[in-house]
Regions:
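Fungal secretory targeting signals
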Residues: 1-29
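Mature, structured extracellular domains of secreted fungal proteins
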Residues: 21-192
Length: 192
């Protein structure tokens, strides 16, 4: 049986018994930007490809750690992979949902006009983090794996929509993240 990424996020959060975590917004220290471009029908969503000098690694339980176990293998397609959702408490200071919708729509537009899949380089490389920003909303995908990953723009779009609507002030949060069950990657949504 096939589930959408949004269904998997709900299932993961529910099965983990997680409504919110004590985890704060995960910050990237000493970030070095390798490239910047704009996406979407109106080219109004800023995209940066970068690397964090101090990488914020997060476990599937939402805990920041200094290292993860190395996995072997080549580039892996992680489209549709389960992830665990964590919201940042307390409420206040989160992104505007409509700004996050612009990013989600830009991802869908590029999925239809550029391609459904994108690649992100291995952890420790100059482009292991992809960040998208529109007005008050920022989302990023961080590869925590030692191999390149392939992910779906439609899945990222669904997660942006989910996190912006579920991890908001009405739910006593100000953004959140979804960490892959195998800890290879996470996607975060936060205020710019």
């Amino acid at each position: 049986m096939k589930f959408s990424i949004a269904s998997l996020v709900v299932l993961a959060a529910t099965s983990a018994g997680v409504s919110a975590a004590a985890l704060g917004s995960v910050a990237c220290a000493n970030e070095v930007v390798a490239d910047t471009t704009y996406i979407g029908e109106n080219k109004d969503v800023k995209v940066t490809y970068s690397h964090c000098g101090v990488t914020p690694l997060v476990t599937a339980q939402g805990t920041e750690v200094s290292s993860l176990h190395k996995r072997q293998g080549n580039s892996t397609n992680v489209c549709g992979a389960q992830c665990n959702t964590f919201c940042f408490n307390p409420s206040g200071g989160g992104p505007n949902e409509s700004d996050c919708t612009v990013i989600a729509d830009a991802l869908l537009y590029d999925s239809q006009n550029v391609g459904a899949l994108f690649n992100i380089t291995a952890s420790g490389t100059s482009t292991d983090k992809i960040t998208m920003q529109y007005n008050s909303c920022t989302t990023y995908f961080l590869n925590q794996d030692f191999n390149n990953l392939t992910y779906c723009r439609t899945d990222w779009s669904a997660l942006v929509t989910w996190l912006a609507s579920d991890c908001n002030a009405a739910n006593n949060a100000h953004g959140g993240l979804c960490v892959a069950a195998d800890q290879r990657w996470y996607i975060q949504v936060q205020h710019t």
